[in-house]
């Protein structure tokens, strides 16, 4: 079965909508192209989110991320675009995306961006 890059992000119903639980997703093989040189840029993407009504379907996320392999994008722009697209399709209570780009020209770049619903307040954290 062949899969193709796809801009369509899919969601499914949150199975425990009454509970704030954290979903973490790590994608170590993100690739895009430097818009200045055309050279590939590699990053590890770390997602952490608290779903509201919908959870992000992982296969569609993989195919969506794969779409960037042949697109030129600045690190800051692509990280924020991914977050915006995830917010648009799933409207999570909270989401954070941390993109850790591999070294390029002696420079490491890490972009962290997040979104929180206006009226959502996190529950008190319990450390055990």
UniProtKB/Swiss-Prot annotation:
Pathway: tRNA modification; tRNA-queuosine biosynthesis. One of its GO terms (cellular component) is cytoplasm. It comes from the Bacteria. This is NADPH-dependent 7-cyano-7-deazaguanine reductase. It holds the Pfam family QueF. It catalyses: 7-aminomethyl-7-carbaguanine + 2 NADP(+) = 7-cyano-7-deazaguanine + 2 NADPH + 3 H(+). One of its GO terms (molecular function) is preQ1 synthase activity. It comes from Ruthia magnifica subsp. Calyptogena magnifica. It is found in: Cytoplasm.
């Amino acid at each position: 079965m062949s899969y193709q890059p796809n801009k369509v992000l899919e969601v499914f119903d949150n199975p425990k909508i009454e509970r704030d639980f954290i979903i973490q997703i790590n994608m170590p093989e993100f690739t895009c192209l430097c818009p200045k040189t055309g050279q590939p840029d590699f990053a590890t993407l770390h997602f952490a989110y608290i779903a509201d009504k919908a959870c992000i379907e992982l296969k569609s996320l993989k195919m969506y991320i794969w779409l960037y392999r042949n697109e030129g994008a600045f690190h800051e722009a692509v990280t924020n675009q991914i977050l915006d697209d995830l917010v648009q399709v799933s409207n999570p209570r909270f989401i954070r995306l941390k993109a850790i780009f591999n070294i390029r020209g002696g420079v490491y770049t890490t972009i962290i961006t997040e979104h929180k619903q206006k009226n959502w307040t996190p529950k008190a954290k319990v450390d055990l």
